[in-house]
Amino acid sequence: MIRKKLLLLFALLPACALCAQKQQDLTAYVNTMQGSHNTPEFSHGRCTPLVTLPQGVNSWSPVGFSYVGRSAAGVGGCGIVLRPLTEAPSPETATATVDTASIIGRPHYFRMRTSDGILSEMSPTERCAVFRFTYPRRSEALLALSGEEMDGVEADAAARCVTGYVIRRSNVSQAADKTWFLLRFDRDFTVDEDRKGGTLLLRFGRGGTVGVQAAVSKIDARQARVTFGRELEGKRFGEVCEAARERWNGMLGRIEVEGGTPEQRRTFYSCLFRTMLRPAQDYETDAEGRERFAYDGEVYEGRYHVNPILWDAYRSLFALHNIINRAEEERYVQSLMRTQELTGWWPSGHVMIGNHAISVLADAWAKGIRTFDPEEALGRYYREITRSAVDTLNNGDYNREHVRGYGRLGFEDYFAMGYIPYPQGTDRVMETTSKTIEYNYDDFCAWRLARMTGNDFYERIFARHIYNYRNVFDPADGFFKGRDREGRFDEDFNPYEWGGPFVEGNGWQWRFSVQQDARGMIGLMGGEE
C-alpha cells in the first residue's frame, strides 16, 4: 500500500504516524453533501451526494433513494428509485421535507430524517447496497419503487423479493442501457395493484423498520442473483456498513494531513473522496469467476471502466492515481485501450475538447506503468486525431451534438495552418482557440511518448506540432486569441468574456493553459520579470 503525507509537500510517513493513521476514522472528515447546493447558475452545486466504494461499480444517491450508476454532471443516472412513504403517493404527497440537521453524508453511510418522521439509511457494497427505513410507530410503512422505463417487474411476496429491469436512454449514447435489479426485504409485504405512473407500491403494515438489500446488473437477471449471493447473502446492515467504512479508511489513509483546522481537514478529505470515485469499474464477476461487462447490448470478457471524464481530470486526477492508486491505474490504462478497441474512439466526455487519453497514457509510461503497448497507443491516437465522429454521422443534430467531442473537429485546418481559424464561416467548429491549445498539448504528449519509447516515426510526426500554441498568442498584449484565416487576431477580443473562441473559461484563464512549456510561455510574455 502506498501512503503519502501532505504538509506543504509530499513526504514518506514515519512508521509511528502510520500506526496512528490506522486508528483514525478518516471517513468522519468526509462530507458527501459538500458541493451539492445546486443553483441555476452553470457549474454551481454539481456534486451528487453518493454512497459507494472507491471506484465502485455502482453508486447510490438520496434522490429518492436511487441507483444512479454512471451519473456525472450533465449525464443522468440509471434511475431505480426507492421512496419510503407513510401514505400512498399523490401529487400532494409526492415529496417530504428533509430535516437538514439530521443528514449524515459519509462515503460508506448516508442518513436523513424527513418531515413524515421516516429515518432513512443506506450503505454500499461493490455492486449492491443495503437500506434501512425506520417508520413512526403508528404510521403506515410504505415503499414506492419506480424507474426509467421500468418493466418486467415481478413481486414475489412469499420470497420477499421484487425483480425487474429499467431502461436508460442516455444523452451520450445511441444505445439504451438495460439494468436488472433484485430487491429483497426483511418483512412481509403486500403489493398495491394500482401501478399508475410506473410506480409499484409495497405495504409493510404499521411502523417499525424495513430492511432492503438491492443488487443490480447490466448483464442479465441471473448475474444480478449471482452478485446478490456473493455480496449480500446473509449480511446485515451494520456488517455491510462497517466493511465499507474500512475500505474507505484504507484508501483515504494513503494520504495523511498534518496541521490545519478541523474544517480544513474536512475540506481536504471530502475532496479526496471525490478523486476516488472515478474512473469507476464497470465489470461483474459471474458464477464461474469470469469478469465480464456489458457494452452496447453485447457482453464481453475482461475489465472495463467508465466515467473517466478525461477533459476534467487528465492533468490532475490521473496523475494522483499514479501516486496513490497505482495498481488500479495499471488496470485503467488497459481499459482505455479496450474502450478504443470497442468503440473506435478514446473516451473524452462526448462534448468536451481534446484527445486526452494520450496524456494519461504518456504520464503512466513516464511513471513506469507498462501495461499497454505504446506503439499501438500512438497508432490509435494518430487515427483518432485525423478524423471526427461528426463526419461519420447522418442522424440529425441531436447525435451530432453529442459526439462532437470524439475525434478532432477542425483537424484539417489545425494540421494545415497550425491553428483553427476563428470565427468560422459555419458553426461546425466552435471554441477554436481552446481547441488549438489543447490539441497542441495532446500532440506534445504523443511526441513525448514516442520519444520515451524510441518510436522515431511518430516522434517526427508530432514534433511538427509541439509549439502550435504560439500561433494563437498575440504578443501585442500577451493573450491567446481567436485568429482568422488571414492571420488577423480578433479585434473585439475581451479577456473577461466567457465563450467565443474559448470553452468553459475566458482569455485570462486560458492564458495559463500551456502546462507543458512554462519556459516557452515565460519567453512569450517578455521574460521572468
Question: Model segments located where?
Answer:
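Accessory carbohydrate-recognition regions in carbohydrate-active enzymes
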Residues: 21-318, 322-359, 366-437, 448-471, ...
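Bacterial Sec-dependent N-terminal signal peptides
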Residues: 1-22
